[in-house]
Amino acid sequence: NVSKLSFCDEFINKLPDKYETIIGENGVRLSGGEKQRLSIARAMLKKSSIILLDEATSSLDSETESKIQEALKVLTKDKTTIVIAHRLSTILNSNNIYIIDSGKIVGSGKHEELLKKSELYKHFYERQIQK
């Protein structure tokens, strides 16, 4: 079930009318994290061959992000996936990572390669992951 895979069922079942609840301006307002989880669920329902994730986990706490990362593995399996992220935890397992600084690609490679050859990437990694 897509709602379980995207962890939407956790908040949907707490809504007044559960899956029948009207959301949006004239209904119940969702948090940023709930909106992101709902967007991921919608993407799972579409059978797209290309997935674009733009800051897909930026409004999530670390625990929920970890759960969503598992859901994203299912969503992106066998699909071309482009991930735009400032959180390195979102991209650590990517096949190829591009570092963009001031609109220019200043580095590319896998995580381990970038740790060795990019001071900028290493700096972000040390600040975010190795606290």
Residue spans for each PLM region:
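Short beta-strands and strand-coil junctions in structured, solvent-facing domains, enriched
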Residues: 10-11
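C-terminal boundary and immediately downstream tail of ABC-type ATPase nucleotide-binding domains
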Residues: 116-131
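ABC-family ATPase nucleotide-binding domain "signature/switch" substructure
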Residues: 2-6, 18-119
